[in-house]
Amino acid sequence: MLRMLKRQQLHPGMILLLFWLCYLIEDQKVQAGNCWLQQGKNGRCQVLYMPGMSREECCRSGRLGTSWTEEDVPNSTLFRWMIFNGGAPNCIPCKETCDNVDCGPGKRCKMNRRSKPRCVCAPDCSNVTWKGPVCGSDGKTYRDECALLKSKCKGHPDLEVQYQGKCKKTCRDVLCPGSSTCVVDQTNNAYCVTCNRICPEVMSPDQYLCGNDGIVYASACHLRRATCLLGRSIGVAYEGKCIKAKSCDDIHCSAGKKCLWDAKMSRGRCAVCAESCPESRSEEAVCASDNTTYPSECAMKQAACSLGVLLEVKHSGSCNCK
């Protein structure tokens, strides 16, 4: 290059300028690496987002957890890191502090015990006016609405407040918000639902449902509407029109369900049978319609499936208590 510059007889100042430009271009060359969505507890980068990306591009989003590795390695090495090594080594997190970290609504950035920035649930409860317990859409009672919002943040995005106060077994004293109506479901829990006054026209006979009350409903919408107006759950016995069955042998259940015979009403209904039940606590015991105490409602349903007969909860607790 010097020989070429001498041949052109350039001014010494111009030669120095060219050398300086070459240095700048070489020094500012973008270094490609790999962008990752998170750094694991083992300190390695995990969940590859994009290979061949500079650190500046990778960290531009400001997302907490995004990390970068500078090694430009073949795909086979990336695969080995992810599958066998628990992630990529020499992991450089984009964020070392909580500065400019956007955790999204209902969350805030907080430094953990290992001095790492982490997004934690911190819902805005400043607009919550009711300070007492609330019943959630999952049927659980929460200490207050703020506690429910924290649970919603921690992986239950569909969780909402059903009504104020503890969850109840009847619609008595339940005040539903807006135009929603209180309905008692099949598990004897009170819920607030919105009643559809108009159902779309039935296009196929496959939409027919036989209700647990022995009435044929044109569609699931029609059954829900009847449930709303009645104020308690009707439930689906089986798909199709109701038939005069002599036993469960006459009833066809869809896959994964078994027919249970209701001797009292002389009709059957299809139910999902659980293979196993979680360990139950003493307060979960129920008294069933056969006057037997079961450790839990799940255990009662298991017994019903084994016997092939319908069992329902008479009341919570032991049969000897009432």
From Swiss-Prot:
Residue intervals of the TB domain = 33-106
**Kazal-like domain ranges (all copies):** 103-169, 189-244, 267-321
Q: Which domain of life is it from?
A: Eukaryota
Annotated organism of origin: Danio rerio
An individual GO BP term: negative regulation of activin receptor signaling pathway
Keyword field: Developmental protein, Disulfide bond, Glycoprotein, Repeat, Signal
- Is Repeat among this UniProt entry's keywords? yes
GO MF term list: activin binding
Q: What is this protein called?
A: Follistatin-A
Tell me where in this chain the Follistatin-like domain is found.
97-120, 170-193, 247-271
Q: According to its UniProt entry, what is the function of this protein?
A: Binds directly to activin and functions as an activin antagonist. Specific inhibitor of the biosynthesis and secretion of pituitary follicle stimulating hormone (fsh). Inhibits bmp-signaling during later stages of development including late phases of dorsoventral patterning, to refine the early pattern set up by the interaction of chordino and bmp2/4. Not involved in organizer function or early phases of dorsoventral pattern formation.
PROSITE patterns xref list? KAZAL_2, TB
Q: Which cysteine pairs are joined by S-S bonds?
A: C35-C58, C45-C91, C59-C94, C98-C109, C103-C119, C121-C153, C125-C146, C135-C167, C195-C228, C199-C221, C210-C242, C273-C305, C277-C298, C287-C319
Gene Ontology terms: cellular component: extracellular region; extracellular space
